[in-house]
């Protein structure tokens, strides 16, 4: 029996066809295309599922699971709020089912990542564990006494939106000083752009031009080339 797992991120949609023991048989990744709207994102999810299930007998597929950033209703598959996707009360489960025929199980991305680590990963055998996910945003998942800690609204372990500096950098959620506003790829890109504006001679400009945009790699590439300004973009912290 095989299963399909999808990681919906603010930058990429990643999927895998896995066995019952967690062994990966096939992997797929494509851009999320958040800027094109929810329909385009759902089309991308459907394309990933279609590619992963190609050539696999549906009777051999035990199910499809998707991890989504933000607050998710695990029972209905509705995304209550996902700031990095711009979604509020969005019926993701229904949208993907209408495109693929698969009835997905959907949960918060960091929660399901924590569950996977507890079942077959580095936290296997542990009664309690905490996982922090880093990407476009910052997520958190908590396993407490062998059970997922989700809270009444499913947002109990949203570690990325703990305020670590009152009145600090603005977060995509609208608040200021969140962990995510300092430790995510979004924060790194912001700091890289600031460093580039302050240092027009920096090699970060050439690195960004080569990649077609300023992204999470820009400062690291420039630093590897000996750029003096690039390390500051990476090393900045709220302390």
For the regions a protein language model found, what residue spans apply to each?
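Short glycine-rich, Thr/Ser-proximal phosphate-binding strand/loop in the N-terminal lobe
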Residues: 2-43, 78-81, 154
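Short glycine-aspartate micro-motif
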Residues: 3-7, 61-65, 105, 129-133, ...
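Short glycine-rich anion-binding loops that position phosphate/pyrophosphate groups of nucleotides
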Residues: 11, 69-72, 135-137
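A cytosolic small-molecule/anion-sensing beta-strand core signal
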Residues: 19-20, 68, 75, 108, ...
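Acidic/polar active-site rim loop that often engages polyanionic ligands
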Residues: 27-28, 73-78, 167-173
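Adenine-nucleotide phosphate-binding core of ATP-dependent small-molecule kinases
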Residues: 28, 34-57, 179-182, 189-239
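Glycine-rich phosphate-binding loop and adjoining helix at the ATP-binding site
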Residues: 33-34, 38-46, 50, 54, ...
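Glycine-rich phosphate-binding loop of actin/hexokinase-like ATP-binding domains
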Residues: 124-183
């Amino acid at each position: 029996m095989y299963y399909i797992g999808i990681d919906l991120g603010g930058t990429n949609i990643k999927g895998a066809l896995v066995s019952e023991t967690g062994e990966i048989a096939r992997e797929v990744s494509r851009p999320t295309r958040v800027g094109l709207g929810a329909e385009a994102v759902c089309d991308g999810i459907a394309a990933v599922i279609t590619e992963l299930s190609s050539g696999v007998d549906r009777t051999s597929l035990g199910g499809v699971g998707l991890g989504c950033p933000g607050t998710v209703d695990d029972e209905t598959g509705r995304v209550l709020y996902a700031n990095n996707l711009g979604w509020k009360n969005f019926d993701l489960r229904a949208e993907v089912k209408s495109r693929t025929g698969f009835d997905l199980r959907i949960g918060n991305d960091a929660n399901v990542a924590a569950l996977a680590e507890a079942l077959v990963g580095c936290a296997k055998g542990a009664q309690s564990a905490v996982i922090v996910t880093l990407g476009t945003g910052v997520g958190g998942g908590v396993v407490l006494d062998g059970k997922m800690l989700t809270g009444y609204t499913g947002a109990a372990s949203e570690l990325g939106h703990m305020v670590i500096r009152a009145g600090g950098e603005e977060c995509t959620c609208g608040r200021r000083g969140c962990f995510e506003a300092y430790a995510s790829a979004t924060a790194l890109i912001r700091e890289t752009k600031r460093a580039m504006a302050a240092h027009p001679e920096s090699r970060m400009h050439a690195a960004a031009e080569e990649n077609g945009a300023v992204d999470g790699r820009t400062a690291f590439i420039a630093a590897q080339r000996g750029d003096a300004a690039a390390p500051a973009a990476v090393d900045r912290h709220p302390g």
